[in-house]
Amino acid sequence: MMMIRAGAPVDEMIQELLPHLEPGDVIIDGGNSDFRDTERRVKEVEARGMLYVGTGISGGEIGALTGPSVMPGGSPAAWPLVKDLLQGIAAKLDDGTPCCEWIGSGGAGHYVKMVHNGIEYGDMQLIAESYFMLRKYGQLENDEIADIFAGWNKGELNSYLIGITADICRVRDTDGGYLLDRILDIAGQKGTGKWT
């Protein structure tokens, strides 16, 4: 299983791995690969007699500690071989059900991860715009905005992103000012938002 930068590094790693693999072996790509690249890789690896699983993984730091959501897709014959492994590392629902199920063939796993990221980025944009409106036009202080977000988080808008936004609105820097007021209004992205 590899979790490396998407694009050429994945292709390079596959080329390094292939001479050491036997027919029926499985390569799992757990990075944020473009689903179209995964489609191509599935075909290329299967042509060599091996199996390829493009796996979307979500959960960040908390997922690293408690288990991520795992979205595998690729060579269908690989699922019985990797199911126990992937479901074993996945987060679990209260009833023990793993947050991992076979998504489909080809690039399906990475496609679902791309859509997941696109929705998350859209949510983050809405939260950022809400903050901007409350701060600039509502003339509210960050503590007041934090109270509003915390209130929203108790109702139908309850989400991890709104909760952490409420928390960060309250954080002060070493000079006693709001940390948010020192953060530049710029952001980068890894590609999945653009692909969506």
Language-model regions, residue ranges each:
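Active-site beta->alpha loop and helix N-cap motifs at the rims of alpha/beta catalytic domains
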Residues: 1-11, 16-19
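Short glycine-rich or small-residue beta-strand-to-loop segments that form or flank ligand, phosphate
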Residues: 1-3, 26-31, 71, 114-115, ...
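ADP-ribose/adenylate-binding Rossmann-like module
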Residues: 2, 18-42
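Rossmann-fold dinucleotide-binding core
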Residues: 9-15, 34-146, 154-178
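Glycine-centered small-residue hotspots that permit tight backbone geometry or close packing
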Residues: 24, 54, 63, 191-193
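Residue-level marker of alpha-helix boundaries and capping positions
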Residues: 32, 121, 185-188
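A conserved active-site cap/scaffold subdomain adjacent to cofactor or substrate pockets
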Residues: 177-196
